[in-house]
Design a protein with these regions (language model features):
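Short terminal alpha-helical segments
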Residues: 1-36
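Alpha-helical rod/repeat scaffolding segments in eukaryotic adaptors/tethers
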Residues: 2, 27-41, 55, 59-66, ...
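A structural signal for well-ordered alpha-helices, especially hydrophobic packing surfaces
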Residues: 16-24, 52-56, 74-84
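Functionally constrained cores in energy, signaling, and assembly domains
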Residues: 48, 55, 96
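Amphipathic alpha-helical binding modules
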Residues: 65-96
Length: 96
């Protein structure tokens, strides 16, 4: 991928990230509320955008940043994908 395309994607992702984060912050739902699932979906989208930015950032791919992104995505996804124990896989990223 050339630098122009990479920079365009990153610029669009920053806009998408700002909109997603603002929507998340405006959602006042708490665990157990009817809107909780929607708030968690917004958080998952936010983390997916962080993964995109980590993946396309200039230089070497940061293993620590990638682990952090995947940990968050797996942890949040665990509540949407049942019977696969994604949280266990997330925790395994940081176990010896």
């Amino acid at each position: 991928m050339d630098d122009t395309v990479r920079n365009d994607i990153l610029a669009m992702s920053r806009t998408a990230h700002s909109l997603t984060e603002a929507s998340y912050q405006q959602n006042m739902a708490k665990r157990g509320d009817a809107g909780w699932s929607e708030k968690q979906r917004l958080l998952l989208a936010d983390m997916a955008l962080h993964l995109l930015q980590t993946s396309l950032k200039d230089g070497e791919l940061s293993e620590e940043a990638l682990k952090r992104n995947l940990f968050s995505i797996l942890t949040i996804s665990d509540q949407f994908i049942h019977d696969h124990d994604l949280k266990r896989f997330a925790d395994a990223l940081y176990s010896p």
